[in-house]
């Protein structure tokens, strides 16, 4: 979640995203051979496709898993699904789940080296959207201090 990051970490992340947005070709295939899994328990178009497109531009292999058509329909728990996917060796698992806190819970049980990204958990948080909104502000106002007396608080 965004709240788990320090202001410095968020600024570094936004600086990197800003650099990528200005010259995407310089970053193409910089993560070749790595794997990202989109684990989505909710219908999604923009968020899932955004993660997939970004990962593919970086040269990553992408696997999309949804609750529909998976063993979740037969009663498999979120944790069992996560452990099964984790055993396949992904570098990153992007999680979208309708229940609050599940992405954080999965991050706590993830093996070292497996990064869990919260792509939305119920009505509580949508960190990737918050970061996109912050990037949009950074692109429009490169110096946040010039936003007429308002200072975004990360």
Give the location of each predicted region.
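Structural signal for conserved beta-strand scaffold positions within catalytic alpha/beta enzyme cores
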Residues: 1, 38, 64, 116-118
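Positively charged, low-complexity intrinsically disordered leader regions
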Residues: 1-53
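Charged, amphipathic alpha-helical interaction segments
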Residues: 22, 59-61, 138
């Amino acid at each position: 979640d965004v709240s788990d990051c320090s202001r410095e970490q968020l600024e570094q992340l936004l600086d990197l995203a800003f650099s990528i947005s200005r010259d995407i070709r310089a970053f193409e295939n910089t993560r070749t051979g790595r794997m990202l899994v989109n684990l989505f328990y909710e219908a999604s178009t923009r968020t899932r496709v955004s993660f997939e497109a970004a990962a593919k531009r970086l040269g990553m292999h992408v696997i999309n898993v949804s609750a529909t058509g998976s063993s979740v329909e037969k009663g498999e728990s979120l944790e069992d699904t996560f452990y099964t996917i984790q055993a396949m060796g992904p570098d990153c698992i992007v999680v979208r789940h309708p229940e609050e806190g599940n992405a954080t819970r999965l991050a706590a049980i993830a093996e070292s080296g497996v990064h869990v990204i919260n792509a939305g958990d119920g009505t509580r948080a949508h960190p990737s959207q918050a970061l996109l909104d912050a990037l949009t502000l950074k692109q429009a106002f490169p110096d946040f201090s010039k936003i007429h007396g308002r200072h975004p608080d990360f």
